[in-house]
Amino acid sequence: HAFAATVQDEHGTFTLEKTPQRIVVLELSFADALAAVDVSPIGIADDNDAKRILPEVRAHLKPWQSVGTRAQPSLEAIAALKPDLIIADSSRHAGVYIALQQIAPVLLLKSRNETYAENLQSAAIIGEMVGKKREMQARLEQHKERMAQWASQLPKGTRVAFGTSREQQFNLHTQETWTGSVLASLGLNVPAAMAGASMPSIGLEQLLAVNPAWLLVAHYREESIVKRWQQDPLWQMLTAAQKQQVASVDSNTWARMRGIFAAERIAADTVKIFHHQPLTVVK
């Protein structure tokens, strides 16, 4: 059965003559896309931690080999797997693109700086490249229906802010980010980019200016800046604080993962949060 697929990726025209059997992916969102059509990559840049991958994504994948971190995947580990396709992130892996091409054909797609709509486009491209175009279209249709279901259970137009909190830094995820655009697609009112920054680092005063009805926080560290802000008198001026509408969410699911399953988990989480139900702990 002759297979040839040609798509436009971030580098230009990309063609494969035969269906890839040994795929290595260098971002978590690409693993999510493959899981959506039950194709298992042999290698994933999973930051040496399989738990970075959502449980519902892991359920669709056979065991894989870690090829190191997303920021600096190991070229040796990738080469050792003898892949016939590498899927890389156009922002993170531009510097190693040439080196990766020495190992196998490289499909270069947006991941790190993508929006929700771009992520779904990437998933469609990946589906086509692995010979599962029909299956991916069906999964994307199902995805749209599921997302509409969850959207219908949320109060339309509610102002919601999601951000990640480290020791010294809070980053607001605006409409231009993946998570922000997922929340916006659910009919929620998400802050716009600030001074051209899609993920600005903001202080408590700036958060007060945004003043969301709901504040959703992924704490990257135990001692996170938001926990300190909560001791500040200004904190009580936040609508979300007054209404007790501040919730903690899982950082892997909400900030690192990205993808079809990840968006569905975020939508399900958001419905639970807005209805004051406990979230399932991600194992």
Where do the protein language model's features map onto the residues?
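Short helix-initiation/N-cap motifs at beta->coil->alpha
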Residues: 9-11, 67-76, 195-204
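Extracytoplasmic ligand-binding site segments that recognize negatively charged/polar headgroups
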Residues: 95, 109-125, 159-180, 222-226
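Basic- and aromatic-lined ligand-binding clefts that recognize polyanionic substrates
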Residues: 22-34, 135-189, 193
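Boundary at the C-terminal end of the N-terminal hydrophobic targeting segment
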Residues: 2-4
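Structured C-terminal subdomain patch of bacterial secreted/periplasmic proteins
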Residues: 214-283
